[in-house]
């Protein structure tokens, strides 16, 4: 679950997430449409579904989120490790601005 700064309805959250880069909203519980891990395998997108209000916390929402961990997790981790090696000057790269965001 997540807690937002202000109360959002599930409909508002769905609309916001639908506009987010790299996010695919796949959410129609009445038709049993929601993302499964198998849907995300080999894909760059993050899939979000089962978006609903969560009354257990203030301004809460529950949602189901799936992504390909190799593409999203491991790949990002590899980039972050490379950036840190460059930052520490451990790779002998002369122009570090190519790798490090300012």
Name each model-derived stretch.
Residues 1-62:
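C-terminal substrate-binding/catalytic lobe of Rossmann-fold NAD(P)-dependent oxidoreductases
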């Amino acid at each position: 679950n997540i807690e937002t700064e202000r109360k959002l309805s599930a409909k508002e959250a769905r609309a916001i997430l639908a506009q987010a880069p790299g996010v695919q909203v796949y959410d129609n519980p009445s038709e049993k449409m929601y993302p499964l891990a198998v849907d995300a395998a080999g894909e760059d997108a993050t899939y979000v579904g089962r978006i609903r209000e969560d009354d257990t916390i203030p301004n809460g929402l529950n949602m189901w989120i799936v992504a390909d961990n190799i593409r999203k997790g491991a790949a990002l981790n590899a980039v972050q490790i490379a950036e840190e090696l460059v930052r520490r000057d451990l790779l002998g790269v002369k122009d570090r601005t190519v790798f490090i965001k300012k």
